[in-house]
Amino acid sequence: MTPNEFFSIKYHILAKAELKAYIDKLADYLSQQSYLYHTLDKPIISDSDYDKLFRLLQDLVNDNPQFKPINSVLDRVGGEVLAGFETIKHKKKMTSLANVFSLEELRDFYDKIEYDIELECEPKMDGLAISIFYKNGKFDYAVTRGDGIQGEKVSENVKTIRNVPLKLNTSNPPEELEVRGEIILDKQSFLSLNEYMQTHENKTFANPRNAAAGSIRMLDSKVVAKRPLKLYSYGIGYFSKDFVYPETQFELMQLLQSFGFTISDNMFLAKNFSEVEEYHHKMSHQRADLAYDIDGLVFKVNNIKLQDTIGYTARGPKWAIAYKFPAEEVESEVLNVEFQVGRTGAITPVARLKPVAVGGVIVSNATLHNINEIKRKDIRVGDRVIVRRAGDVIPEVVKSLPQYRKSDAQMVEMPTNCPVCDSKIENVNDQAIYRCTGGWHCQAQTTERLKHFVSRKAMDIDKLGAKLIEQLVAANLIKYPADIYKLNFEQLTGLERMAAKSSQNVLDSITKSKEPSLARFIFAIGIKDIGEVSSDALANHFGSLESFRDAKFEELIEINDIGEIMANNIVSFWHDSLNIKIVEEFLAIGIKIQNPVKVEHAYNESFTGKTVVITGSFENYGRTELTQLLKSIGAKVTSSVSKKTDMVICGDNAGSKLTKAQELGVEVILEDNLKDLL
């Protein structure tokens, strides 16, 4: 049918069954036109006709909601605002590719396969990895990568992406099919979005990848629907037995395209390594001119049977490799050096730069790490410098170019007083890190401490974000953790951009956090160098806050994961009268800390009572899953290897922990032997 034929039908006089058939036909027609426009870039009707037909479908469904088609173009406009995302397990683990950083390493990968092979070559999109599940050809749900074992269900947001098929374009779909791809925002759309964000929300995204990832994790799919996200498919994950798998990777990509998915138009089939080199050379030179950001290239063995023969490691397939482009370096000028204050008072110098594009991002700030680095690199205000940025790494100043130095270039000196609160800055034990001594009296430290206090692994007050903390501190509404629990509705609604619903959500989130575990509370109060694992060890050892407060240095250093520096920091924390006052005030307002419950563990000869460290990645276990399993049989799982460690459980790609275990003579257990011991 044509648009005019749809318009000519007198749908208002149709019988119910005929009207439903008309609505279904119109929805299918619009889905096909959307596919032609967004995926193939070959529209056959005008934008005006599409908009009119879309509006007609909306009106018909609004008047006849019982006839709303499942997985139609109407789902692309977004729906209700969600309270949060459900976490679900992947049917097939979402692994990662191993990386190489030079043509020599790429050649090694090619030679190790020991076969005369073809490689399917494609750009490595710099976006958000996603899995989309289809049942009998219809969109079922979508999940982010997460930790590879489980991810967040973001179906409503992914449905709004115009080139994501809501129905597979095939008359014989498999019962189940999981399609994997990368959600991106092209360069021009990113610039347009940032212009809008700057004008309407006074903030911008750092790069297209962050914009895509941030958009998919929004709770309001109607906002996501307005953002021009795009999906590029690169393969499949889980599939049912009735799926006929093609013989080659290249044919698989063609099949996905026939199903309605967008694939890269820069794919290439290399018949030998010379053609791989040619592809690498071509894409390296074309990278800057592509419509979207790429951070490398992906090479996959083309023959599917050969892929199965070559196999997998726990981390990912051995038949594919990711070539990562080298870090991009450009010249800029140091306009000024400012000093930032962190949660523990650490003073970090930051270079304010003449804005320059590095790795697809406009960079105007770069870390200088510490004053010793500044002196070592001889960086001065006014210098021309080399700035480097790779992936999501914070931009850094690599070196100065003294040959271009002006006579008025100024040396950088560490201030003697805090730039925020004017307290003394001290350098303890002649270390590289200088610290503000203001503590809770320093607004910068207060703000960062409160951000840490409400964070997910601490008190988990998820609706109280970093920007809102800054607003509350600036408005003198909070200064100490207990102040958070004294906030009221009127105070919150009086802040900029805080409507009634948002304010109530914050208050509900605060109330929900009033019964933290002892481990969470210890982590939340922010004792220097005490992280999540150490907090857990302290909570399990002492059993209550009262016992922890009375801890002696000698007892602390006997605990796994607690060294002398950490023990000193704990003792110093409880010797500070302000810290004690803050904790007591916190308890006085009715916070109920949940002490750990002593659990009788199942006895296991190999692990009960043993101190265990886990390192590397595992084929049959997630890290969290393995940790919980070991704890359930009485093992103490710690994060670092020491003389107190009884054994190290080692997966693929183990690093320094394995080396240290071997140096100390600690028993090493490989995954192959682990199952028998468990």
Curated annotation (Swiss-Prot):
Active site: 124 (n6-amp-lysine intermediate)
Cofactor(s), by name: Mg(2+); Mn(2+)
Record: residues binding Zn(2+): 418, 421, 436, 442
GO biological process: DNA repair; DNA replication
Enzyme Commission number(s): 6.5.1.2
Domain BRCT residues, every copy: 602-678
Catalytic reaction(s) noted: NAD(+) + (deoxyribonucleotide)n-3'-hydroxyl + 5'-phospho-(deoxyribonucleotide)m = (deoxyribonucleotide)n+m + AMP + beta-nicotinamide D-nucleotide
Positions bound to NAD(+): 47-51, 96-97, 122, 145, 182, 300, 324
Function in brief: DNA ligase that catalyzes the formation of phosphodiester linkages between 5'-phosphoryl and 3'-hydroxyl groups in double-stranded DNA using NAD as a coenzyme and as the energy source for the reaction. It is essential for DNA replication and repair of damaged DNA.
Protein name: DNA ligase
Species in which this protein is naturally found: Francisella tularensis subsp. tularensis (strain SCHU S4 / Schu 4)
